[in-house]
Amino acid sequence: MIVAVGSTNPVKVEAVRRAFSLFWEADVRGVDVESGVPKEPFGPNAIEGARNRARNALRALNADFGVGIEGGIFHLFGKYYCAGFVWIERKDGVHSTGMSGWFECPEAFLPDMLRGRELGDLMARLSGNENIKREEGAIGFFTRGAVKRVDLYTHGTLMALAKFIAAGRWPR
């Protein structure tokens, strides 16, 4: 089974590999595709970006599954949260979605993010690690490594895989 991830970010590719390998033998490959949304998407744009990444990756590699993971900012209950939205699409067009765990977005970052700055860029400046979004991520920095970005995205991928894992158990 070939699984195409709509990103070459090693964190996203590894998260998908971890999730799929719990249930299937899969050849997980990252591919650079367009998301069609701003670099730091808010709300529905993150969902759209994940969908676009999954579909573009599926086509690019003629894979069995396409997976799009789009980190974004979501506004709920008067606060902004960072989370990853995951869209998984099978080659027959059946899709499923999931989300990673959420954490509150630092208020000090919001003015820059609302102007289009990416969380990863702000975290690079704060942490001194230019590759933070390709490594531990903001959550790894803030939790001192207790939770890493790959953990969040693995969780989100598993949530999106539930429909496919359940197979005959999934209600119709």
UniProtKB/Swiss-Prot annotation:
Record-annotated disulphide pairs: none
Entry binding sites for Mg(2+): 34
Keywords, ordered alphabetically: Hydrolase, Magnesium, Manganese, Metal-binding, Nucleotide metabolism, Nucleotide-binding
Keyword Translocase in annotation: no
Annotated EC: 3.6.1.73
Catalysed transformations (reactions): XTP + H2O = XDP + phosphate + H(+); ITP + H2O = IDP + phosphate + H(+)
Subunit structure: Homodimer.
Protein role: Phosphatase that hydrolyzes non-canonical purine nucleotides such as XTP and ITP to their respective diphosphate derivatives. Probably excludes non-canonical purines from DNA/RNA precursor pool, thus preventing their incorporation into DNA/RNA and avoiding chromosomal lesions.
Single GO BP term: nucleotide metabolic process
Family affiliation: Belongs to the YjjX NTPase family.
InterPro entries, per the entry: ITPase-like_fam, Non_canon_purine_NTPase, NTPase/PRRC1, YjjX_NTPase
Organism of origin: Korarchaeum cryptofilum (strain OPF8)
GO MF, one annotated term: ITPase activity
Protein's recorded name: Probable inosine/xanthosine triphosphatase
Residue sites binding substrate per the record: 7-12
